[in-house]
């Protein structure tokens, strides 16, 4: 079997950033998948499931309620390796195109207080596995990167 595209990225040199993972075409519709890499793979500790789960709930809620991107959001969810998230949008985008959106979203995550949306037994199959303070921490940390993001953090390393 051939490796899938995401397994051909050199995870030994990959740093936190926002990368176009792939673009798929369905008829005339382009779908862009983004690799939102929050930690340095195999270098930094991965995020724990509780904060990943919380970021997923907050990020998905933010995106599905966004004035511009709500109807373009196909999916937002964690990578199995717990080093980041995938964001799938309808449209042909570059990493630069979505930096403003991600700045808004991660500020929302960093500043969020109160009940995590969907964190109830009726709404979620693992609602007790949440950690809002750590989600706030990761939101602040990634916001700092987004505020000063450089080109090398917007394109996969060779």
Swiss-Prot record:
Residues annotated as transmembrane: none
InterPro entries for this protein: LuxS_sf (IPR037005), Metalloenz_LuxS/M16 (IPR011249), S-ribosylhomocysteinase (IPR003815)
Reactions catalysed according to its record: S-(5-deoxy-D-ribos-5-yl)-L-homocysteine = (S)-4,5-dihydroxypentane-2,3-dione + L-homocysteine
Residues where Fe cation binds: 53, 57, 124
Gene Ontology terms: biological process: quorum sensing
Cofactor(s) named in the record: Fe cation
EC number: 4.4.1.21
Keyword annotations from UniProtKB, A to Z: Autoinducer synthesis, Iron, Lyase, Metal-binding, Quorum sensing
A GO molecular function held by the record: iron ion binding
Cofactor binding mode and count: Binds 1 Fe cation per subunit.
Subunit structure, as described in the record: Homodimer.
Record function comment: Involved in the synthesis of autoinducer 2 (AI-2) which is secreted by bacteria and is used to communicate both the cell density and the metabolic potential of the environment. The regulation of gene expression in response to changes in cell density is called quorum sensing. Catalyzes the transformation of S-ribosylhomocysteine (RHC) to homocysteine (HC) and 4,5-dihydroxy-2,3-pentadione (DPD).
UniProt xrefs under PANTHER family: S-RIBOSYLHOMOCYSTEINE LYASE
Family: Belongs to the LuxS family.
Descriptive protein name: S-ribosylhomocysteine lyase
Lineage of the species this protein comes from: Bacteria, Bacillati, Bacillota, Clostridia, Eubacteriales
């Amino acid at each position: 079997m051939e490796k899938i595209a995401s397994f051909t990225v050199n995870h030994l040199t990959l740093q936190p950033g926002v990368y176009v993972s792939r673009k798929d075409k369905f008829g005339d519709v382009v779908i862009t998948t983004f690799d939102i890499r929050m930690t340095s793979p195999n270098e930094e500790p991965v995020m724990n499931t509780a904060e990943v789960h919380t970021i997923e709930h907050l990020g998905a809620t933010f995106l599905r309620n966004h004035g511009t991107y709500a109807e373009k959001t196909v999916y937002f969810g964690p990578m199995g390796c717990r080093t980041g998230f995938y964001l799938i949008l309808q449209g042909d985008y570059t990493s630069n195109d979505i930096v403003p959106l991600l700045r808004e979203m991660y500020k929302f995550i960093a500043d969020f207080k109160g009940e995590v949306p969907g964190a109830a037994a009726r709404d979620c199959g693992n609602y007790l596995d949440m950690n809002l303070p750590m989600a706030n921490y990761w939101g602040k940390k990634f916001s700092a990167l987004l505020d000063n993001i450089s080109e090398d953090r917007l394109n996969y390393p060779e």
